[in-house]
């Protein structure tokens, strides 16, 4: 079994490649939930939904979010009434979020609700939220005010000067992971930290109490999301700078170096040298390239 740490864009492309090699039931995905939010009475978990739509064959792989061919009748109807959602939800996608919100209101944990929804979609892979706590990433603006990550990236398109990134739990308690996540790490043949944003996608997972300790005893590989000083996608460069790290593969390695046995850097990333890094083609522009990267990556894993 392989466990993958994932956000919502770069890593699902790698998971698509892994699925050409492994059976779905051999893959566990630990998913970032620090970009979740309550919206329109719904509990929206974008990264979890991207992963479960990928496994169920529903994902829109042009945008890498939402359901392929979904309609937006409800979203546009609300716009006419003067209410515009921060995150545009398709109608079928909305059904997922309605169900999740109701399950949580009934007293289910996010782990339980995720399992129930995945079962409904016929997913045999195991999809685990990183935590059952309600947690969010906030950027720290220049005036010291806090802005939810979704407002920063979706609402403001990242056009805000920031100087920090923090995590806040609703219950005010330290962020902790779940027993299911720890078991998945310990029982895996290895863990892959995918090429998602190190600050807002992978960072929250690693900050969950118990995760870094569990990784110390499991072979762990990480794939850099950077080529040069630019991420393949998303706002990782600005966020890394605000977090106090170089917006490069070297900066990413500094975030992960205490938990990784193998660090993968793109073959084109010639200006940056990371100590001990291995070079692979990490540009997953199509399914074949994703499969090729997955094969190469798994070849490094120790046989059990």
UniProtKB/Swiss-Prot annotation:
It is an enzyme of class 2 (transferase). It holds the Pfam family CofD. It comes from the Archaea. InterPro entries: CofD, CofD-like_dom_sf, FbiA/CofD. It catalyses: (2S)-lactyl-2-diphospho-5'-guanosine + 7,8-didemethyl-8-hydroxy-5-deazariboflavin = oxidized coenzyme F420-0 + GMP + H(+). Coiled coil: none annotated. GO terms for biological process: F420-0 metabolic process. The keyword Transport does not apply. Pathway: Cofactor biosynthesis; coenzyme F420 biosynthesis. SUPFAM superfamilies: CofD-like. The keyword Chaperone does not apply. 7,8-didemethyl-8-hydroxy-5-deazariboflavin binds at residue 49. GO terms for molecular function: LPPG:FO 2-phospho-L-lactate transferase activity; magnesium ion binding. Keywords: Magnesium, Transferase. Its cofactor is Mg(2+). Its EC number is 2.7.8.28. NCBIfam families: F420_cofD. PANTHER family: 2-PHOSPHO-L-LACTATE TRANSFERASE. Catalyzes the transfer of the 2-phospholactate moiety from (2S)-lactyl-2-diphospho-5'-guanosine to 7,8-didemethyl-8-hydroxy-5-deazariboflavin (FO) with the formation of oxidized coenzyme F420-0 and GMP. Homodimer. HAMAP family: CofD. Belongs to the CofD family. This is 2-phospho-L-lactate transferase.
